[in-house]
């Protein structure tokens, strides 16, 4: 059976974690305190009970610092928390006379709201900030909202949002920087037809720069069309724009992803010849390209090139080398690189473990047992994986009949204050119900809803079938009531973007 957090344990979590007599500074922020606050917020049964009284009781306003607020919001974002909870916490922080809000905290709150399609609340927050804290409005906050509107809305709605920001929120005449943000919104969603249309329609007004052209070039590259990328590059040059190192980096990445590693290396040589700055990021891209080309010797040569050029390899460079070795089937070599990385004092991150998991899954030598070993190492480091890794591990555990490991992963995520992705819940529910463990599946679904996230229709139907056969329909009715309450606070299917 899946164990609930006991009432005593939860009360310990709710014990005041911050002393009202001392303020948290950037040097004294404690990871455990951040985690405990995240668990309190994420685990609170909102909207059934208001969250502000809990915040007031357990987080004294006098103890809040801008860094602490930003760290908590960052954890709530990573934890896929309900947007309204994040908004309530941000608003609570505004009550502190000692802690002025920061752009970072505002942007994180806005991002959490927009990601969950709470557009009414996002616009209201923008308007409130415009009125009370206008200095918090930034290019980044504009980009966050426009990108999500471009994702969930239409071409026309995105343009209307751009005009609304100019006239009602920022209240100034927009220039090329804002124009670039609008283009990036469409390019991020790989809507290159729309991005090109915007460019042709408005470029005479905004006088585009090389950054404008690089944004469009990146859009074509991300759309996976290397031919269109190169055609636009030549158009860019024809229009009189001078390519820079960013331009070359985009083109190199495009060729690497399309397995045209030779062309990527030719561009790299051109960069050297033209005396462009060679960055760790450029070399990291080429290391990834070596892996795609299944050339582990070149991957190592390029990695060593970083130090030869007086640069310092970062976690991303090590991850690229490990990933390339994994693609070439050299799992043992990747393990050695990970040890080398740790010896240099560079901490492995979620991408490191994701690469290790993928490599071991494909390896006959390490296989499932190797994944389990590194899963435990990840937990020992208190490292929380990103959503793709969670879903991948859940699928692996459940499909290999190790449903208890799936439950262990679920419990670990909740203990860290995270609400696992809906697809992870579907995988776990399917495996549990297939093994006649409907009560455990119900508990996972209840925990999801309690944290302000809805369960999918397939999950509910599986529970309905399994619990009906066990004569436990009362549980199902309770869950249905909670879902209906939650739906009243979630954005409707037909959302208002403006």
UniProtKB/Swiss-Prot annotation:
rRNA-binding keyword on record: no
GO biological process, one term: mRNA splicing, via spliceosome
Domain of life: Eukaryota
GO cellular component terms, semicolon-separated: mitochondrion
Residue stretches of each PPR repeat: 102-132, 138-172, 175-205, 209-243, 244-278, 279-313, 314-348, 349-385, 386-420
Keywords: Repeat
Coiled coil: none
Keyword DNA damage among UniProt keywords: no
Family in the record: Belongs to the PPR family. P subfamily.
Entry-linked PANTHER family: OS03G0856100 PROTEIN, PENTACOTRIPEPTIDE-REPEAT REGION OF PRORP DOMAIN-CONTAINING PROTEIN
Protein name per UniProt: Pentatricopeptide repeat-containing protein At3g61360
Natural source organism: Arabidopsis thaliana
